[in-house]
Amino acid sequence: MATWITTPAELDAYFQQRPARIGLDTEFIRERTFWPQLALVQMAVGQDILLIDPLIPGMTEALAPWLADESIIKVMHSASEDLVAFKWACGVLPRPLFDTQIGASLAGIGGGMGYQKLVAEITGVALAKGETRSDWMRRPLSESQLQYAADDVEHLFALHDAIDAKLQALGRQQWLHDDGERLLASVANDEDRWPHLAMRSAQFLDAPAQRRLLRLLRWRDVQARSSDRPRSWILDNELAATLARTPPADAAALATLFEQFPKAPRKLAGAVWQALDTPLADEAEAPLALPANDTNKQALKRLQDAVAERSRELGLPDGVLASRKHLESYLERANGRPHWRAGAAGAGVAAAGAAAGTLKRRARRRIAIRLPSKAMKKGDPDHRAALCIPAVRWREDPPPWQRLTSSCSARHRRCAVRCRPQPYSSRSHP
């Protein structure tokens, strides 16, 4: 039977004898805000299940010291969004963290398993899913909501015991610790310096357009955080990409363009214009999303095959040792894997990476982009931009995987865009 906690004193009473671990989960709303609005905190302490009302004044402040206490293990499942909610509401992150979803993946039980499925796999208990989309800000909560909330933490200790035992037997407890620390660090430092790389449309934009897109997305993020509104309510991705690709000549042209987009931020038109037209101090350092070609697809396929073979040897589910995103990052920057994975991947993956780095695409003239990342379909209307991007030197002293030859493979015939080639020199770029 769960206990409803309505005062900080009631919460503190359960920590008079400091527990070795607590189970945690949250319910929150994030439909109309940038930050999640914490609506309920579920906590397992020993044999007790606590349902803590964070809407009561002083409750989040009372909760914060126990979340931050590093002598207490925090057992959670798929914790990333819950961590953001705790950070915003309580000002702290729960650590040390034992994420049962990550742990189940590393233990070879299954990758990306939901809580209900993992509970059924380990304990045999079938849990209901009926209140997933419930209104958790409403008071009082219904009996079915209370039962659903209690179920979310009731079995966390059983999962913790089973998964930790298997990780210990496999010698992978440090793996889980590393991934937990990485997750906590990503939530603590959640401002993405290069948000344009996460947009698929960026790979179809040339270098100046990508920099304009970066300006708009940086501005949008600041506005969303300060006004506590979803990013898409400030400026949606489609409009941002359109503005970056074909910037309006003046403010009047911007207003005309906004008429084509019902959700355009007309009241912020002046700020959008200023953001679009004002270079960032660090935009010259920005990595650019590179289009894919046959060479890159071959390189990615080699790495995927090598990773899949190594994953089978380790008994890991697909995508755990290295996801597609990790491999694309590895190809793009040769730095895509968390550090425990570097050793676990083994020589086979390293060899595949080395082989991928030597692949070259041969067309009418050679392109020597060694290791770009993003996928791109041939025949795309913006394919012409992709063909011309390699003709530009990206930075004065690029790393080996960014070395470029002097001209675009299209030779201006298929794209009708005049490149400004800069000769490649092996002496200036050893």
Question: Language-model segments: which ranges?
Answer:
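Non-catalytic, usually N-terminal nucleic-acid engagement modules in DNA/RNA processing proteins
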Residues: 32, 39-43
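N-terminal accessory regions of nucleic-acid-interacting proteins
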Residues: 1-22, 26
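Active-site-proximal helix-loop-helix substrate-binding element of RNase H-like nuclease domains
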Residues: 42, 47-62, 66-157, 164, ...
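Accessory DNA-binding and partner-docking regions appended to nucleic-acid-acting proteins
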Residues: 143, 159, 163-360
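Positively charged N-terminal leader segments that act as targeting/secretion signals
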Residues: 360-393, 397
